[in-house]
Amino acid sequence: MGIFGFFNKDKRETLDKGLEKTKTSVFDKLARAVAGKSKVDDDVLDNLEEVLITSDVGVDTTLKIIQRIEERVARDKYVSTSELNGILRDEIAALLAENNSEDQDNWDLPGDHKPYVILVVGVNGVGKTTTIGKLAWQFKQAGKKVYLGAADTFRAAAVEQLCIWGERVGVPVVKQQMGSDPASVAFDTLSSAKANGADVVLIDTAGRLHNKVGLMNELKKIKDVMKKVLPEAPDEVMLVLDGSTGQNAFEQAKQFAAVTQITSLAITKLDGTAKGGVVIGISDQLKVPVKYIGLGEKMEDLQLFNKRQFVDSLFNIEH
């Protein structure tokens, strides 16, 4: 795994533990859906549809999965209920694979320029600043020089929290006083990072989704100002979502996608919820890659998302 700081086995154990509630919920419902049935018929498919929707996979993605299973049943003439788990696993894996982003297996950065700039967006309370802090730690563990920019200048708590993370991880935080222009903070951050040979920059932003026009203009201005320092910036616009909110995360994702172009997703708080199906639905509906998932409180519990490992863990497949 290159310079990734811990072993695959530990990562898989964290993933299994983090998805425990989702797995228990889905497979308990699945067992009830096929109870007393030997073959997959319309009743089983209706029950499966309900299982997926109540597991926060989302209506559109659920209907897509059901249609594919219906086609398979029609083609094979007879499909036993004992085969349903395997078929469902195949279809979920295929859906995630269609979002043809490459899974990263280490914390190396794409591109041949420095620094690599990640603009982080998301509403307050989803774990945005915590995710930035944990990402900073992961990148630092991988030998990267990291800079943080506190461009959420509307909340004193946001700047303060980012500074605490900066101290904890041991990386510089560029900030200005409360109420400053967020674009000015972004400009200063990139200027300092570039001058000091940083490898990666993470910029925190305000999550004021209730004022869409204001947020759209603010993010556009931040991007425009960044380009004055680095024409390629930002390399990534990452939306942080709270996985435990299920369908609310869906709605937030759609609303943010309408405000600015999102290029990657970080889905947090999956360890305390049975709503892990939201990962499948959001990835399918937005056609934006899930890049990171949060599976616990520890620094290393923020993991690079790997589609195959996620499906294998969900269906308890060992390699």
Go through each PLM region and give its residues.
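Short glycine-rich anion-binding loops that position phosphate/pyrophosphate groups of nucleotides
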Residues: A206-R208
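Non-catalytic, surface-exposed connector residues within folded enzymatic/regulatory domains
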Residues: D42, L63, Y78, S82, ...
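Short hydrophobic/aromatic residue motifs in ordered secondary structure
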Residues: V59-T61, R155, D271, M299
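Short beta-alpha junctions and helix-cap segments that line functional grooves
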Residues: I3, Q104-N106, L135, E251-Q252, ...
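Conserved catalytic-core segment of NTP-binding enzymes
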Residues: Q161, D181-N196, H210-H319
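Primarily NTPase-proximal linker/entry elements flanking Walker-type ATP/GTP-binding cores
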Residues: D16, E20-A151, A158-M178, A186-K194, ...
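Switch/coupling subdomain of P-loop NTPase systems
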Residues: G2-F4, K9-L15, E20
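Short acidic/polar alpha-helix capping motifs at helix-coil junctions
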Residues: R12-D16, G125, T153, L215-L219, ...
